Swiss-Prot record:
Part of the 50S ribosomal subunit. Contacts the 5S and 23S rRNAs. The keyword Ribosomal protein applies. The lineage of its organism: Archaea, Methanobacteriati, Methanobacteriota, Methanomada group, Methanococci. Belongs to the universal ribosomal protein uL18 family. GO terms for cellular component: cytosolic large ribosomal subunit. GO terms for biological process: ribosomal large subunit assembly; translation. This is Large ribosomal subunit protein uL18. PANTHER family: LARGE RIBOSOMAL SUBUNIT PROTEIN UL18, RIBOSOMAL PROTEIN L5-RELATED. GO terms for molecular function: 5S rRNA binding; structural constituent of ribosome.
Length: 193
């Protein structure tokens, strides 16, 4: 019943909206490890995966919560956190002598400036070689948090709205206007691991 002239049941992971098998096959045929980047509302995860018959093997992984342990005080789900997570993954990968990969964006749409491409840019800045197009990566101002700084400065006139919007930043002891400098400090710390 699963396959006949009228009806074909797709693979389970495709039905669940988890895997695009055609895209996966194309990535696996490259023979390189895959840089798998995934974003949720509050976190970013990046992994370098290698194919194995029994199941994919994780070579190196990084999570935005690791940034908090390194002293990051910003939000773990924004663009600067995605960039720093990619940078951390790239630094770990270069240490493990994994310098080439292909980006696996999964079922995410390829939107210019998306967090997945911020992870890619971080891995590239750490010294990895990953094929990409330069137009898809966000501007440097967005990767280091200048857009957050500009928004905080524009909101500064309304004290209540400012405190409400940036309460977690202020609670952790970071002024949102200082985010670009904070990102640069952490970038240096990661590259000197």
């Amino acid at each position: 019943m699963a396959m006949n002239a009228k009806f074909r049941v797709p693979f389970r992971r495709r039905r669940e909206g988890k895997t695009d098998f055609r895209q996966r096959l194309g990535l696996l045929l490259s023979g390189k490890p895959r840089l798998v980047a995934r974003k949720s509302l509050n976190n970013v995860t990046a992994q370098l995966m290698a194919y194995d018959e029994k199941g994919d093997v994780v070579l190196v992984s990084a999570h935005s919560k690791e940034l908090v342990k390194m002293g990051y005080k910003g939000h773990c789900g924004n663009l600067p956190a995605a960039y720093l997570t990619g940078l951390l993954l790239g630094a770990k990968a270069v240490k493990e002598d994994v310098k080439e990969a292909v980006l696996d964006k999964g079922l995410h749409r390829a939107t210019k400036g998306a967090a997945i491409f911020a992870v890619l840019k971080g891995a590239l800045d750490a010294g990895m070689d990953i094929p990409h197009g330069d137009k898809i990566i966000a501007d440097e101002e967005r990767l280091n948090g200048t857009h957050v700084k500009n928004y905080a400065e524009s909101l500064k006139e309304d004290a209540d709205a400012y405190k409400k919007q940036f309460s977690k930043y202020l609670e952790k002891g970071l002024n949102p206007e200082d985010l670009p400098e904070h990102v640069e400090e952490l970038k240096e710390k990661i590259l000197n691991l």
